[in-house]
Amino acid sequence: MVKLAFPRELRLLTPTHFTFVFQQPQRAGTPQITILGRLNQLGHPRIGLTVAKKHVKRAHERNRIKRLTRESFRLRQHELPAMDFVVVAKKGIADLDNRALTEALEKLWRRHCRQAPAS
């Protein structure tokens, strides 16, 4: 049985990890959300989240966006390539309902799977 946990090893934790992705990213995006990705040598994907207070004013909305993004990643982690991902929320993301946000994330994960070089 496949484990769908979200342990610490699957998260980008330090500014160095984020900087690594920002240097040479592969981009996939919609008007409300962008996912940056860069291949890593770890053999598994990792995720980092940036939801700026400038774009999403209320804390409960920022938390909802982060929660749904983590859940989407957790469920697809075994299908994703070994890349470090940074999810960047943009203006207007708070207007998306849960279903629309989940569908947008699924579309972007599929796009990253297609863009990733075959290993």
From Swiss-Prot:
Protein name (record): Ribonuclease P protein component
The organism's place on the tree of life at top rank: Bacteria
Stored NCBIfam families: rnpA
GO biological process, one term: tRNA 5'-leader removal
UniProt KW keywords: Endonuclease, Hydrolase, Nuclease, RNA-binding, tRNA processing
Organism field: Serratia proteamaculans (strain 568)
EC class: hydrolase
GO CC list: ribonuclease P complex
Enzyme Commission numbers on file: 3.1.26.5
